[in-house]
Amino acid sequence: MRRLVVFAVLATLVATGTALAARGDPQRRITPADEARAKAMLVRQSDLPGSTAGAPTPNVDFYCPGLDASDLTLTGDANGRRFAVGLMIVASASEVYESRADAGAAWRRATGAEGVQCAKSLLGRQLAQQRGRLVSLRQIPFPRISDRTIAFRATMTATTPQGAVTAYVDVIALMRSRAHATITVGSALTTPPRSEELHLARTVAKRMANAMRGA
């Protein structure tokens, strides 16, 4: 769930929502069954007709004491590919924890005040390196479609040869049983379409429910 608070700003001015780092990461005891569950939850190209597929989302090293997850254990994780549709980019990621207690602890840390502050600091630094600026990062309303659901929106500006551009990145996080999944939707010039976000989130939530049934 640490990946909820990480946004790597891309050359396209759209951010992705996945990252892992060595320091503060959960312990890894990956099992084939939970790894398969994590992969089954991801957004697929067939979910986005007319999209083009890119590389998996990049990793970004970061550390915030309030998000230290070294006392928790992951048993599966997956990092999805990026998909582009017009000015919109979509990415997804998933994690399966050893226990519901670990999953709950990770969720609370990432969605609490320290998690949001970590995201603001990290995103601000990354944008500054690319001649950009973070305008705001805030929680936005989103319907509950899983055991737990939360969404955030980052608004940012960047300087391009064509002038200043505003970009928006929404991160929707879901928790089901021992699993977390994030869907990241980025868009330049206008906010991401809510109908598309709902479609993707409901699709992932259904896959999570199927993958975690009996687990």
Identify what each model region corresponds to.
Residues 43, 47-53, 98-102, 108, ...:
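Sec-exported extracytoplasmic/periplasmic mature domains
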Residues 1-4:
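Positively charged n-region of N-terminal signal peptides that target proteins for export
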Residues 7-16:
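Bacterial N-terminal signal peptides
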Residues 77-113:
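A short acidic-to-branched-hydrophobic micro-motif
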Residues 22-86, 119-134, 138, 214-215:
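N-terminal "mature-domain start" segment
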Residues 25-28, 45-47, 132-212:
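A short, solvent-exposed beta-edge/loop patch
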Residues 17-21:
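Sec/Tat signal peptide C-region and signal peptidase I cleavage site
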Residues 32-34, 90-98, 186-194:
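Second-shell loop/turn segments in exported
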